[in-house]
Amino acid sequence: MKKIYIVLTHTGTVLSRIIKVYTKDEFSHVSIALDKDLKQMYSFGRLNPYMPFPGGFVHEYVNSGTFERFKKTRAAIYSLNVKEEEYEKIYNAIKKIQDAKEPYKFNIIGLFAIALKLRIHKEHSFYCAEFVKYSLESSGIETNLPVMIRPENFKSLKNIKLEYKGTLKNYRKTCQSVL
């Protein structure tokens, strides 16, 4: 068995506050990490820490980029045990998008359509929660997640375990003290 991590965050950016207003959820963004240290953390989001657009596939880092700029980012980090072959399929799904970044776009229309309770999905287009759901389902994991997915929905995954809740910048310190 291996572990993957579902990382829910709220940076406090204007866009994240808008999302929070219409979802009424604690967290406005989700990433998937393939390691406990969150060095292999991926999502769809802003490409530039200073501008919300354009967005796209991002390899996120706790201590640089958007999360470095927004030091008070709140986070809830969950672990999920997966079989070795499921882990490999998740890795391969992420790698496929990472290697072919160009055709993949940020689904900004789909993100805002949630406020209207509409699902708008275009091929090769994701917002953060769609991407994480896609990554999990590519491995064959039964998620039972809704079609109109929000970051908070990942808390309902079967066998998911809360590992940490607090500021994202303090997670690595907490993680290292446990090791």
Each language-model region and where it sits:
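Cysteine-nucleophile amide-bond enzymes
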Residues: M1-L179
